[in-house]
Design a protein with these regions (language model features):
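Conserved alpha-helix/loop element of class I SAM-dependent methyltransferases that forms part
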Residues: 112-129
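A conserved beta-strand element that flanks and buttresses the S-adenosyl-L-methionine
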Residues: 211
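A short, conserved alpha-helix within the catalytic core of class I
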Residues: 218-231
């Protein structure tokens, strides 16, 4: 005999006044509509399920890319072995209590997964480099990852504003060995001019690779161009991983409290076109603009790749000096 008793769960759902008001056939699939209780999660919600799902998918994607690469020649080619090759060398990644997932016994957080993607992209160049410059490194995740994966690095120069450098210095001092930490030279924005003069008197390029990830897009255009000119004169390679465009908050259902913040963001960086970041044709067109905009004078594009998932409107590009 079939039990015709209603589920208590569904009785509660159908008696919910909110859902009674949101069952219109014209709108039941929109954000906040009744369909989020039937076939899918709501597009906007307060849990971490979407973030963790994207993190897992990113780990899977990157791990497969590494394992299938012609430059990856490791005995451990099982699932998880690709990202493990880099992550296992990066100690103390849990500082700061990041959100993590477990991918084939790799405890993965987003920041260090991004770092693995970046050092894998730059692997060939990093192996032969001694001097690295990173402009605007955030709290230092990439510096941490590079210094622990590439022991050939002798000097790691970091340029940032003073208040951010305080966090970077404190973080890296905690996670790095004293010998690796001693390789870092912190250069305040105010001391950048002295660093430029020091580079000018050098008989050869002071920097092997200059790096900027996710910050040139947030800096005034004239400052970005000044950095690119310095890189052009003093570096063999330049690696950029920045947003290729701007987007309107409505595209991701953000309700602005202060339009001044958005208007200020539109003035930053070199790529200021506002596009639909979920339109493949618009992204493909804007990538060409980005690749040209961030190429230093007398440099050429060496290689590039699109970014994954929530970073699909970002792009990795490595430029090489024509004089190298």
């Amino acid at each position: 005999m079939v039990n015709k008793k209603k589920s208590n769960l569904w009785e509660n759902i159908f008696s919910d006044d909110f859902h009674q008001k949101n069952k219109s056939i014209e709108s039941f699939r929109q954000i906040g509509g009744f369909n989020n209780r039937l076939t899918s999660w709501d597009a906007i919600e307060t849990s971490s399920r979407y973030f963790k799902s994207l993190l897992y998918a990113f780990a899977e994607n990157l791990d497969n890319r590494i394992l299938q690469s012609v430059i990856f020649h490791q005995k451990d080619n099982r699932l998880g072995g690709g990202i493990k090759y880099y992550l296992k060398k990066i100690k103390n990644r849990s500082l700061g209590r990041p959100i993590t997932i477990n991918y084939y016994n790799n405890i993965v957080d987003l920041d260090y997964l991004l770092s693995v993607e970046e050092i894998f992209f730059l692997k060939s160049e990093l192996r032969k480099s001694k001097n690295i410059l990173e402009i605007g490194p955030g709290y230092g995740r990439l510096a941490h990852s590079i210094l622990q994966n590439f022991k050939n690095i002798k000097n790691y120069y970091i340029i940032d504003v003073d208040w951010m450098s305080e966090l970077t210095r404190a973080y890296l001092k905690r996670v790095l060995s004293s010998s690796d930490f001693s390789k870092i030279e912190f250069i305040s924005f105010d001391n950048y001019q002295k660093f430029k003069k020091r580079a000018e008197v050098s008989n050869q390029n002071l920097i092997d690779i200059s790096i900027n990830t996710n910050s040139f897009e947030e800096i005034e255009e004239n400052i970005v161009r000044d950095y690119l000119l310095f890189i052009s004169n003093n570096s063999q390679y330049f690696y950029s991983k920045n947003a290729i465009c701007k987007y309107h908050p409505n595209a991701v259902d953000i309700k602005l409290k202060d339009k001044a913040h958005y208007e200020a963001a539109l003035r930053m960086g070199l790529c200021k076109n506002v596009i639909d970041i979920y339109n493949s044709q618009a992204i493909a067109k804007q990538r060409k603009v980005y690749l040209k905009a961030y190429c230093p004078k007398n440099f050429k594009l060496s290689k590039d790749e699109k970014c994954f998932g929530q970073f699909l409107y970002y792009h990795s590009a490595l430029y090489e000096s024509k004089n190298s």
